[in-house]
UniProtKB/Swiss-Prot annotation:
The lineage of its organism: Eukaryota, Fungi, Dikarya, Ascomycota, Pezizomycotina. Binds 1 zinc ion per subunit. Its EC number is 3.4.24.-. Secreted metalloproteinase probably acting as a virulence factor. SUPFAM superfamilies: Metalloproteases ('zincins'), catalytic domain. It comes from the Eukaryota. This is Extracellular metalloproteinase 2.
Length: 609
């Protein structure tokens, strides 16, 4: 990790990544289509707070401007000859920082991987910013004038053929939507929803390429395939959105059945803050007597199909979800318990993240946003014992306003099989994909962890939150934790090394990233770094045993929750498709915004190891 600090402020340029991790990584990754050959190259730049303060001290802004106007002026002054649009997902976070996102355009057509994010401080001045705008030669003619490109149906056929998608186009017809050059395909089968196509540019190899962005949700992969607008069997790049009452449950903080016994918990939303004003079983219009509410719909899905509305859920008119589990039972025998556990874990994590700032405006997963901004109608669909796979899990994160989807599988690595729903770390890891994909680049853009290093950090954030939440009061920085050990029945877990601050047990440093070409290995390095961050802050501020943090002047008063808050706030600051150095700078900037930099030394020490 020493290289991460030494990389310094010059890290506005992307880092190169190549090679393979030392050990075969397993679990918690989408099955099916390998998108690694099609990932976008890293192009983002990030101006951290200190550099931004020096750079924009003479920037002209008016005290009468709101934060969106100030952000817009910065983009115009930085790229005066470029065209762009404001993405409609700006908001002010709980730390007082305003977040505004912009998409570059050419001839009125989006450049899909060209983004600019501006973060405005409480004083109305630019706090930090990042961008991946295209600075090369623009197309001289508007492609819509001559329409010298293939129709979207050919692009759909090209994506299916090239990527071997399990979609049958049959008599596909492209039906125009309200948005210009956007189409929905009718007459197909094999996808969970109707495929879509939109005409967009992408930047690649220093040039702009006109493409059809073909969207196909095939379950284990929810893909945006950028098909060349003329040579429709050429797929330039691919983005995958999947990354994947009374309750008798394993209580919050118990990672799996080896750590304790199920207990009775009554009305848990009363102890989890303001994130669920309708309780966990209502959405402001409907009250449910099953494992469904404003935040989560949890059900079984033995067929593995895309239908979920009418799938089985435990039901109790008295809201008494009390079911039995023992380790000799097969998963099917305790599905009521498993669905209830999944419902409990995801709702609790939703409410915890809400307290940290993953709110309606920030793009969280809720049916009813209760007039607080954001798109709504996008609670998380959580499938227990999903029959589409085994020994894994995934979470699909489309943009704000579309449902997130979690698929939890059974694990055949033990006899009897084990249910991943009972390992909280796996559930938290998957839901954290929804968090990071909604926050990085803004809630309207789910493409901002699509590059290799950024995607690796997406995996690392999941492991970080899973590990931070399972810490016990008597743990010390000499305590190590694994991922997936119980479900996989694998001593040492499914990662290369356990998370530990001692380099004799976990020798990973930032320099190891250079030899990796797989997101889970990269994620293990990132989570290892964040585990040091976590313990440095706990050593400074202690660790609360409460589920929800206590806030003092807007910041959690204990180290564990402060670490989780700073990591979350950092996601909102960093550019689309960040690298390690930019993410590090964003976390340090998040501390500057939240505590006036009180924890900079502890953070820098962790990043310099």
């Amino acid at each position: 990790m020493h290289g991460l600090l030494l990389a310094g402020l010059a890290a506005a340029l992307p880092l190169g990544v190549a090679g393979l991790p030392a050990r075969q990584q397993s679990g918690l990754s989408p099955r099916g289509i390998d998108i690694n050959p099609y990932r976008f190259a890293s192009m983002a730049k990030y101006s951290e707070h200190k550099a931004t303060s020096q750079m924009v001290h003479s920037f002209s802004y008016s005290k009468d401007d709101d934060y969106v106007a100030t952000a817009t002026k910065l983009v115009k002054s930085t790229f005066p000859n470029m065209t762009f649009r404001t993405v409609k997902d700006h908001y002010i976070g709980t730390n007082g920082i305003g977040h505004v996102h912009f998409k570059q355009t050419a001839h009125g057509i989006d450049i899909d991987n060209a983004d600019f994010n501006v973060n405005i401080g409480r004083d109305g001045k630019v706090f930090t910013f990042g961008n991946s705008f295209y600075e090369g030669e623009m197309p001289k003619t508007n492609p819509l004038t001559k329409r010298d490109f293939a129709d979207p149906v050919k692009a759909l056929h090209g994506a299916i053929k090239t990527l071997k998608l399990p979609v049958k186009p049959q008599s596909a017809k492209a039906m125009p939507m309200k948005e210009a050059e956007t189409f929905m395909f009718e007459g197909t089968s094999g996808a969970l929803s109707e495929p879509m196509a939109k005409l967009v540019y992408i930047q690649k190899d220093g040039k702009l390429h006109l493409t059809w962005r073909v969207e196909t949700d095939v379950g284990d992969n929810w893909l945006l395939s950028y098909v060349d607008s003329k040579e429709t069997e050429t797929v330039h790049n691919v983005v995958d959105y999947v990354a994947s009452a009374d309750y008798k449950v394993f209580a919050w903080g118990l990672n799996d059945p080896t750590e304790g016994q199920p207990t009775m918990i009554k009305d848990p939303w009363n102890t989890t803050g303001s994130g669920s004003p309708f309780t966990w079983h209502g959405d402001g219009e409907m009250d449910y007597t099953v494992t469904r509410g404003n935040n989560i719909a949890a059900q079984d899905n033995p067929s593995g199909g895309g239908q979920w509305e009418n799938n089985y859920r435990p039901e109790s008119p008295e809201l008494s979800f009390v079911y039995e589990y023992n380790e000799q039972m097969e998963p099917e025998q305790y599905k009521d318990f498993a669905i209830t556990q999944l419902f409990y874990t995801t709702n609790t994590f939703h409410d915890l993240l809400y307290s940290f700032g993953f709110t309606e405006e920030a793009g969280n997963f809720q049916m009813n946003n209760n007039g607080k901004g954001g798109e709504g109608n996008d609670f998380a669909i959580c499938n227990a014992q999903d029959g589409s796979g085994t020994n894994n899990a995934n979470f699909a994160t489309p943009p704000d306003g579309q449902n997130g989807r979690m698929r939890m599988y059974t694990w055949t690595t033990a006899q009897p099989s084990r249910d991943g729903d009972l390992e909280a770390g796996i559930v938290i890891h998957e839901y954290a994909h929804g968090l990071s994909n909604r926050l990085c680049g803004g809630p309207a853009n789910s493409n901002c962890l699509s590059e290799l290093e950024a995607g690796g950090m997406g995996e690392g954030w999941g492991d970080f939150y899973a590990t931070a939440i399972r810490l016990k009061q008597d743990d010390t920085r000499e305590t190590d934790y694994t991922m997936g050990e119980w479900a996989a029945n694998m001593e040492g877990g499914i990662r290369e090394y356990p998370y530990f601050t001692n380099m004799q047990t976990n020798p990973y440093t930032y320099d190891d990233v250079e030899g990796m070409s797989e997101v889970h290995g990269i994620g293990t390095v990132w989570a290892t770094i964040l585990y040091d961050v976590l313990w440095n802050l706990i050593d400074e501020h202690g660790m609360s045993k409460n589920i929800m943090p206590k806030f003092v002047n807007g910041a959690p008063s204990d180290g564990r929750n402060l670490a989780m808050k700073l990591v979350l706030d950092g996601m909102t600051l960093m550019p689309c498709n960040p690298n390690f150095v930019q993410a590090r700078d964003a976390i340090i900037d998040a501390d500057q915004a939240l505590t006036n930099g009180q924890n900079k030394c502890a953070l820098m020490k962790a990043f310099s190891k």
